[in-house]
Curated annotation (Swiss-Prot):
Its EC number is 2.5.1.39. Belongs to the UbiA prenyltransferase family. PROSITE patterns: UBIA (PS00943). Pathway: Cofactor biosynthesis; ubiquinone biosynthesis. It is found in: Cell inner membrane. This is 4-hydroxybenzoate octaprenyltransferase. GO terms for cellular component: plasma membrane. It is a multi-pass membrane protein.
Length: 288
């Protein structure tokens, strides 16, 4: 009996950290890799690469823990989230907060092996990770905070590798903010009806009937910024082919969200993993 209860608790913790749903970690991992490869001119330091890769999965898990704590009074009313560990009672509020602190401390321990500039920047990253889940209570722009939180590994990566924050670093950071608004708006379109009932704010609600148009404009802006980044650091032709393929993926996403059907909007969200991968491959092979 005790063993069964322990296993059940462990599985609940795994669900809280979304170990069974790696898409969020991957959407955080790709921009981190973009930055490390660009900052390292195609040859990232192995120690730095390992620290950031581990940090991505740890901080994503920490972000899920604090997000579910912030949403604990709302998730029970949303079809997609009502079986999560907190609303279902499998994990207590105290346990979720302890998990967040433990994961954040382990992540900070890894950061301490980097240079001082990266260490100082990590404090901003932690603040953004904590802030995001609560922004949706009073603002329609939580996706912008998510973009900043998910993209903060970009300036941290440049700082860790080169101890500098060049123009391409901040352009790439802006690219990631646009991308985060794109995919998290698609994600929020899945829950829009439930969110309207319970008062949760999102860009999907703010954009209303212009949601598809604004997503399309952000996709175009993202591609134009990526062209500028490639020009600034002299990336090769294969990088621009990856941008063309990314544009094709964006067109496919527009087709998926055309009817605003829940399942298809979620598929559009998931498709962004391929966007991140294609862009990384374009950067990677430009340095080969």
């Amino acid at each position: 009996m005790a063993g069964s209860m322990a296993q059940s608790k462990w599985l609940a913790y795994c669900r809280l950290m979304r170990i069974n749903k790696p898409i969020g970690a991957l959407l955080l991992l790709w921009p981190t890799f973009w930055a490390l490869w660009m900052a390292g001119k195609g040859i990232p330091d192995m120690h730095i690469l390992l620290v950031f890769t581990a940090g991505v999965f740890l901080m994503r898990a920490a972000g899920c823990a604090i997000n579910d704590f912030a949403d604990r009074k709302f998730d029970g009313y949303v079809e997609r989230t009502k079986t999560r560990p907190l609303p279902s009672g499998a994990i207590s509020e105290k346990e979720s907060k302890i998990l967040f602190v433990v994961l954040a401390l382990i992540s900070f321990g890894l950061v301490l092996t980097l240079n001082k500039m990266a260490i100082w920047l990590s404090a901003v990253g932690l603040a953004l990770a904590w802030l995001y889940p609560f922004v949706k209570r009073f603002s329609h722009f939580p996706q912008f905070v998510l973009g900043a939180a998910y993209g903060w590994a970009i300036p941290m990566g440049f700082a860790a590798v080169s101890e500098s924050l060049p123009l391409e670093c901040w352009l790439l950071f802006l690219v990631n903010i646009f991308w985060s608004v794109i995919y998290d708006t698609q994600y929020a379109m899945v829950d829009r009806n439930d969110d309207l009932k319970i008062g949760v704010k999102s860009t999907a609600i703010l954009f209303g009937r212009f949601d598809k148009l604004i997503i399309g404009l952000l996709q175009l802006a993202m591609l134009l910024l990526l062209v500028l980044v490639g020009y600034l650091i002299n990336l090769g032709g294969i990088y621009y082919w990856s941008l063309l393929l990314t544009g094709t993926l964006f067109i496919y996403q527009q087709k998926l969200i055309a009817g605003r059907e829940r399942e298809l909007c979620f598929q559009a969200f998931l498709n962004n993993n391929y966007v991140g991968l294609v862009l990384f491959l374009g950067i990677f092979f430009s340095y080969v």
